[in-house]
Each structure stands twice: as C-alpha cells, then as structure tokens.
A protein has these predicted regions:
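The feature encodes the CheY-like receiver
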Residues: 18, 60, 88
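Acidic, metal-coordinating helix/loop segments flanking the phosphotransfer/catalytic sites
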Residues: 34-52
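Alpha4 helix (beta4-alpha4-beta5 surface) of REC/receiver domains from two-component response regulators
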Residues: 66, 87-102
Length: 122
C-alpha cells in the first residue's frame, strides 16, 4: 500500500490543529480523516479506513489514553501516536502503557510526526 492509500485519523478537539494536520498529511501524500472528539471517532471506528491514529491526550470528552483503552476493549488495534501540549512524564508513561508507539510534544517538527507514522504503518 502506498502512502497515498494510507489513511491517518487525527483526533483533536482543536479545529485549527485538525485542519493543519490534515493539510500536512495531504502534503506528504497521506489521506486524512479528522475527528473532533474521542466519542466521534468511536462512533465511526468500525467504518474508518485509518491505518494509524494521531490522538491528542487532552480531549474535551474523554482523554486520548481512555480512547486507546476503549478501542482495545472493542478489539480495534490501531497503532496510536499520542500528542500533547504538556510534556509530562506521567502522561507520557500512561500513553506508552496504553499502547502508544510515540508521544509527541506540541509543537513538533513535521519530520518527527512522519517518522512516527512510518514506524506505525510499515
């Protein structure tokens, strides 16, 4: 599957961040699905074509870590890249324990994101 056929789901409650991530993903040849909340993604998870999730830790409804736990409980196995404005060791450890393959501290360089995505979708 080429990068242009790989869909990355972005779950972030910040509309500007979702738009920026979708634009960046498109510029690098990926498809993007964006979701404004964990609940919105959970509602669509069974029909999502995503090969990887990029999830903000601090969401308006449930946290990104809670989303990862819910997906695992529902037998969905997406590679998850977590991102957060705070670089907190406790949150980072929770993200890793929830199965996160990367934890990105906002703002992060585009190349850091794409290195994590390449690791996730190989």
């Amino acid at each position: 599957m080429t990068d242009s056929h790989k869909i990355i789901a972005v779950v972030d409650d910040d509309p500007e961040m979702r738009a920026a991530m979708a634009s960046l993903l498109s510029a690098y040849g990926y498809g993007a699905e964006t979701f404004d909340s964990a609940q919105t993604f959970l509602t669509c998870a069974s029909t999502s074509r995503a090969t990887c999730l990029v999830v903000d830790i601090q969401l308006g409804d449930i946290s990104g870590v809670e989303l990862a736990h819910q997906l695992a409980a529902d037998d969905f196995t997406y590679p998850i890249i977590f991102m957060a404005a705070l670089d907190d060791e406790v949150i980072r450890n929770q993200a890793v324990a929830a199965g996160g393959i990367a934890f990105l501290h906002k703002p992060f360089p585009a190349q850091t994101l794409f290195d994590a995505i390449k690791k996730a979708v190989r």
